[in-house]
UniProtKB/Swiss-Prot annotation:
Belongs to the AIR synthase family. This is Phosphoribosylformylglycinamidine cyclo-ligase. InterPro entries: PurM-like_C_dom, PurM-like_C_sf, PurM-like_N, PurM-like_N_sf, PurM_cligase. It catalyses: 2-formamido-N(1)-(5-O-phospho-beta-D-ribosyl)acetamidine + ATP = 5-amino-1-(5-phospho-beta-D-ribosyl)imidazole + ADP + phosphate + H(+). GO terms for molecular function: ATP binding; phosphoribosylamine-glycine ligase activity; phosphoribosylformylglycinamidine cyclo-ligase activity. The gene is purM.
Length: 352
């Protein structure tokens, strides 16, 4: 008989009991997000979901995303309550731009050592995001992987599926010269540009928990959860039928995201003076001495979503969005692009 001690999975760094405790903690979160189309609860091998009634030619739309290095900031600040909403927002906002209603969401949480309290806090945030988006949290994967991540550090990924009527897909093909561009405000940098943001914090030596901007701690401004635009945009589509294109302003800012929904030969002319840039972006620009063009190439600079409608639909669109509690404004219009011109023209750029 070998005298070698018996080695358990726990000895190897994986605590099955902790994983099971987490599942129990988050069952209520998932239940709060349930849609009638979802069949069964958490814990099965696969999640089942019917297509909602009323669709004639339903088209499924899928997306996956993470929250980038905003997660590193969350870990450094030990602030985990809103990063889950960020994760949902990054996925569902990408779906709604083609007119899709998000149906269900799954998450992947990987860590070196599972901290049940932290993981439950993150998943509670995911559930809150799903409620804001009107989709069901139907499952996920929690992977405890010692040796792959340092201590209780974790990484997140989200996966979402939505549905849209085939004849009502919004793809930008109807965008025409003279159309108006309407913007919706962001809550801050959302979930993009955080490698630049963290570098600026490092170089400036700023204590972001002590720095105050507009009466708020810089840390809170940087960790403000990504806004979820799903319900106001679905209402806008239903109210007006006027939406020709939408762009979720993520990594790449206005310069890289608007062209993704423009047809050949169209140019978006944006008036940067049409909104007051939130103080957090001015602080980042000043402390990092960031070029103005680079600001708009990396960060959203206060714009979370851009919507294209015909000029004669502007007032109806603004009214619908305001009725949903949004603060929209006209940010620019569509022009015919000169040969070789960029698809986005930024006018009235700041000089500093």
């Amino acid at each position: 008989m070998s005298k070698q001690p018996s080695i358990s999975y726990k000895d190897a760094g994986v605590d099955i009991d902790a994983g099971e405790a987490l599942v129990e903690r988050i069952k209520g979160v998932a239940k709060r997000t349930a849609r009638p189309e979802v069949m069964g609860g958490l814990g099965g091998f696969g999640a089942l979901c019917e297509i909602p009634a009323g669709y004639k030619q339903p088209v499924l739309v899928s997306g996956t995303d993470g929250v980038g290095t905003k997660l590193r900031l969350a870990l450094n600040l030990n602030k985990h309550d809103s990063i889950g909403q960020d994760l949902v927002a990054m996925c569902v906002n990408d779906l709604v731009v083609c007119g899709a209603e998000p149906l269900f969401f799954l998450d992947y949480y990987a860590t070196g050592k599972l901290n049940v309290d932290v993981a439950a806090t993150v998943v509670t945030g995911i559930g809150a995001g799903c409620e804001l988006a009107g989709c069901s949290l139907v499952g996920g994967e929690t992977a405890e992987m010692p040796g792959m991540y340092e201590g209780e550090d974790y990484d997140l990924a989200g996966f979402c599926v939505g549905v849209v009527e085939k004849s009502e897909i919004i793809d930008g093909s109807k965008v025409a010269t003279g159309d108006a561009l309407i913007a919706l405000p962001s809550s801050g940098p959302h979930s993009n540009g955080y490698s630049l943001i963290r570098k600026i914090i490092e170089v400036s030596g700023a204590d972001i928990e002590q720095v105050q901007l507009d009466g708020k701690a810089l840390a809170d401004l940087l960790m403000a959860p990504t806004r979820i635009y799903v319900k106001p945009l679905l209402k806008l589509i239903k109210d007006t039928g006027a939406v020709k294109a939408m762009a979720h302003i993520t990594g790449g800012g206005l310069l890289d995201n608007i062209p993704r929904v423009l047809p050949q030969g169209a140019q978006a002319v944006i008036d940067v003076a049409s909104w007051n840039r939130p103080a957090v972006f001015d602080w980042l620009q000043e402390k990092g001495n960031v070029d103005e063009h680079e600001m708009h190439r990396v960060l959203n600079c206060g714009v979370g979503m851009v919507i294209c409608v015909a000029q004669d639909q502007v007032e109806a669109a603004l009214a619908s969005l305001r009725a949903s509690g949004e603060s929209p404004w006209v940010i620019g219009q569509i022009a015919e692009a000169a040969e070789g011109a960029a698809q986005v023209q930024l006018n009235n750029l700041k000089t500093h």
